[in-house]
A protein has these predicted regions:
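Short loop/turn segments at connectors of secondary-structure elements within structured domains
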Residues: 45, 56-59, 90, 106, ...
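Beta-strand secondary-structure signal
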Residues: 48-50, 61, 95, 111-113, ...
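Short hydrophobic alpha-helix segments
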Residues: 82-83, 205
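Short proline/glycine- and polar residue-rich coil/turn motifs
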Residues: 84-92, 104
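Exposed aromatic-hydrophobic patches
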Residues: 93-101
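Solvent-exposed beta-strand/loop surfaces, strongest in extracytoplasmic domains of secreted
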Residues: 171-238
Length: 238
C-alpha cells in the first residue's frame, strides 16, 4: 500500500501466521476500531478496506457502521449509502477503495463488516506453535468478530482476529465540527445549554441551532456558519 494514497492503517492482525478460515455463503466477519486522528482542522476519512482471501472468486459485500453497541458490529449507523459489492478473482491480499469516503470523528468507534455472498476462505491471525516457529497474536475483547448465521461471536477468547483493515486519509476543513466543541447544560431546560470552542462561547442561531428536543433528556444541535455537523447534549436533571 502506497503511503501517498493512504495516511493511516487500522488493523489488529500483527503476526505472520498464515491462518485460514473457511466461511459459508452469508457469513460475516468484522473488526471494530476507534478513530484517532480527526481534529477541528482536519477530518479523517475512511478511503479503503483491505482483506485477505485464500480462495478464488469470493463474492463480498462491505458496509461500515458508526458507533455500534458492544458485541454487535452491525448495530451502529450505516456509513455507506449502499454496501460495496464485488468479486475477488484471485487469492491474496486485496485493497478495495470505497466509491465515497466516510468520515469518522476522533473517538468514534466504527465497524468494518464484510458479508460473503459466496463460500470462501479468508485470512485470520491467532496464537499458534509449529515447534519450529510460533506466532503470538495479542487481542482484546471487542476487536474482532465472526457471525455464524445466528449471532456475533467475539474472537478474543481464541486470541484470534480476522485480517481486515481500514485505510484512512486526512483532509483539511474550514468548518469546525460541533463534536470537537465542549458543551454544558446549566439545568434541564434546553435554553440553558452552553457551547464553546477553545474558551469561546458559540452563539445560538449564528453558530448553531437546536434541531431536536427530547423532553428534558437531551437536545440535538446543528452547526451553522463556521461550524458543521450535529451534537447531542444531555441536560442536567438536578
Amino acid at each position: 500500500v502506497k503511503s501517498s494514497e493512504y495516511k493511516y492503517n487500522y488493523f489488529y492482525d500483527g503476526s505472520a501466521n498464515p491462518g485460514i478460515l473457511k466461511l459459508k455463503k452469508g457469513q460475516k466477519f468484522a473488526n471494530v476500531f476507534t478513530a484517532k486522528k480527526g481534529s477541528a482542522k482536519k477530518k479523517e476519512l475512511i478511503k479503503a478496506v483491505n482483506l485477505v482471501t485464500w480462495s478464488a472468486n469470493v463474492k463480498y459485500s462491505i458496509q461500515i457502521y458508526r458507533n455500534p453497541k458492544d458485541g454487535r458490529p452491525t448495530s451502529g449507523t450505516k456509513m455507506l449509502k449502499r454496501p460495496v459489492t464485488g468479486t475477488i478473482r484471485e487469492a491474496g491480499t486485496h485493497t478495495i477503495d470505497l466509491p465515497r469516503k466516510a468520515e469518522v470523528l476522533r473517538g468514534d468507534k466504527f465497524a468494518v463488516v464484510v458479508k460473503l455472498r459466496s463460500s470462501g476462505k479468508i485470512g485470520f491471525d491467532e496464537n499458534d506453535d509449529y515447534h519450529w516457529v510460533s506466532f503470538v497474536n495479542k487481542t482484546k475483547k471487542g476487536q474482532s468478530y465472526l457471525y455464524d448465521h445466528r449471532k456475533w461471536n467475539d474472537l478474543n477468547p481464541d486470541h484470534a482476529t480476522v485480517r481486515l483493515k481500514a485505510y484512512t486519509v486526512m483532509q483539511p476543513v474550514n468548518k469546525i465540527h460541533l463534536r470537537y466543541c465542549k458543551a454544558d447544560s446549566k439545568n434541564k431546560n434546553p435554553k440553558g445549554i452552553v457551547l464553546y470552542y477553545k474558551g469561546k462561547h458559540l452563539k445560538k442561531n449564528k453558530d448553531y441551532k437546536i434541531v431536536k428536543k427530547e423532553g428534558y433528556k437531551y437536545v440535538i444541535v446543528k452547526g451553522r456558519g463556521r461550524y458543521r455537523g450535529t451534537k447531542k447534549i444531555y441536560l442536567k436533571t438536578k
